[in-house]
UniProtKB/Swiss-Prot annotation:
InterPro entries: CAT-like_dom_sf (IPR023213). Its EC number is 2.1.1.-. Mainly expressed in petioles and, to a lower extent, in roots. It comes from Melia azedarach (Chinaberry tree). This is Epi-neemfruitin B 7-O-acetyltransferse L7AT.
Length: 451
């Protein structure tokens, strides 16, 4: 089921970027991050036209949909002009209007055939428009964003949008997708324009110390070996039961994200105990969207890496679920409006270095790190270009000795309200233990088909 590349091109904005906007300065929070393309993948079946079975008609409709995607990009890029540019260096993006990198690919089998494969999720790397080589080496001249649209026999379609983490976070890419949808559906006037104030709120540092970067923080937790990803689906009923189980006097009404995070943390920590023979200090981290912490609130369409990591250190004791929820809630609450304000203005760099120093100290106290990133409530399952919502939304699966630091979990919504699909990335030997965890199996289904 190898995709055939039909075309590669650059799609340019419909209007030229003004001269005073040609250079987009990265903000201080962007400098803390690093370049790596992260993908959002949307899967659309051809079930909106149930009475059509003629291949010629199906191909015509799919061709129209593909053209709609391409023709609505230029106007979208005029608003999100850095997406059509290239990375200049660690300080700026050259908004040169060269265009967003766009790949069209085709698969001869159906989308249903893809979902019927064993471990299909670990084969979706075929839908991404970048090479692993672009994750290392020089970043100068790399596209800020890339898109691949893959069409399938009988009308299925997959859209993969990728963004460099040096430029922005998941909210940034999500905002672009929503604006693209508004343009495609002829509602461009209703689309909110991106807010590019981050570089003035969080002024960059021309000489930025390498030790104060997220990459350096994570170095102690990079592992060599074979990595695998598995998906664990928690349906609404299981989450309701789990929330009842983890509730306590400290956190009386835990969120579904907190409840699922606590369970996965304990199960992974139990897997480590089975591997090493005893509990070891573990650092639990959760990425926090700081736009909602600002006073006043920052616009949700604020571009950049407006996120920080909440850290909770778990020592050698046997972890209880309610205790883990309490630790996570306390850590997340520390990423508040005052913390965000401390990173702004002339004192922002010194305060960021102090925060990075504190995080580094926590990292040195832990033997392993479990990293959570929640994409829940992004609205990705509602991305409708005019032919219906996606049947599934995913990130990228892995299976092999790929560059990765282990123990990473991405939490995502499904098309059914209240569910969470957790993408878990571990060393294969750790995953083999986790898959057998009876407590996890009681609440979650592993690797279900979205069909």
């Amino acid at each position: 089921m190898e995709p055939e590349i039909i075309s590669r091109e650059s799609i340019k904005p419909s209007s030229a970027t003004p001269l005073h906007l040609k250079t987009h300065k990265l903000c201080l929070l962007d400098q803390y991050r690093h370049h790596a393309y992260f993908p959002i993948v949307l899967y659309y079946p051809f079930n909106q036209e149930p009475n059509i079975s003629d291949p010629t008609q199906i191909n015509h409709i799919v061709s129209e949909r593909l053209q709609l995607l391409k023709q609505s990009l230029p106007e979208t890029l005029s608003r999100f002009y850095p997406f059509a540019g290239k990375i200049k260096d660690n300080l700026s993006v050259d908004c040169n209007d060269e265009g967003i990198y766009f790949v069209e690919a085709r698969v001869k089998s159906s989308l249903s055939d893809y979902f019927n494969q064993p471990n299909f999720a670990n084969a979706n790397y075929k839908f991404i428009p970048f090479d692993v080589k672009e994750l290392s080496g020089s970043i100068s001249g790399l596209h800020v964003a890339k898109i691949q649209v893959t069409t399938f026999a009988y009308g299925g379609l997959v859209i993969c949008a990728c963004l460099s983490h040096l430029f922005g976070d998941g909210i940034t890419l999500n905002s672009f997708l929503k604006s693209w949808v508004a343009t495609a559906c002829k509602n461009a006037e209703e689309a909110e324009r991106p807010n590019n104030d981050a570089s003035s709120l969080f002024p960059q540092q021309e000489i930025y110390p390498k030790e104060a970067t997220w990459t350096e923080m994570c170095k102690p937790f990079y592992r060599d070996g074979r990595f695998v990803s598995r998906r664990f689906l928690f349906d609404a009923k299981a989450i309701a039961n789990l929330k009842d189980k983890v509730a306590s006097s400290l956190v009386q009404n835990p969120s579904r994200v907190e409840a699922v995070s606590a369970l996965l943390s304990r199960c992974i920590m139990t897997a480590f105990k089975g591997k090493f023979g005893s509990h070891r200090p573990i650092l639990l981290t959760h990425t926090v969207n700081m736009r909602r912490k600002a006073k006043p609130l920052m616009p949700e369409y604020s571009m950049g890496n407006i996120v920080w990591t909440a850290n909770a250190l778990c020592t050698n004791e046997e972890p209880e679920l309610d205790g883990l929820v309490g630790k996570l809630r306390e850590a997340i609450m520390e990423i508040n409006g005052d913390f965000l304000k401390s990173l702004q203005g002339d004192e922002g760099f010194l305060n960021l270095c102090e925060a990075a120093k504190n995080e580094s100290a926590l990292c040195s106290s832990a033997v392993e790190r479990i990293t959570f990133s929640s994409w829940c409530n992004f609205g990705l399952v509602d991305i409708d270009f005019g032919w219906g919502k996606p049947i599934w939304v995913s990130t990228i699966g892995i299976d092999g000795p790929v560059p990765c630091f282990s123990n990473t979990i991405i939490l995502m919504d499904t098309r059914l309200k209240g569910e969470i699909e957790a993408w878990v990335y571990l060393l294969e030997e750790d995953m083999n233990i986790l898959e057998l965890d009876k407590e996890l199996i009681a609440f979650a289904k592993m690797d279900p088909s979205p069909m």
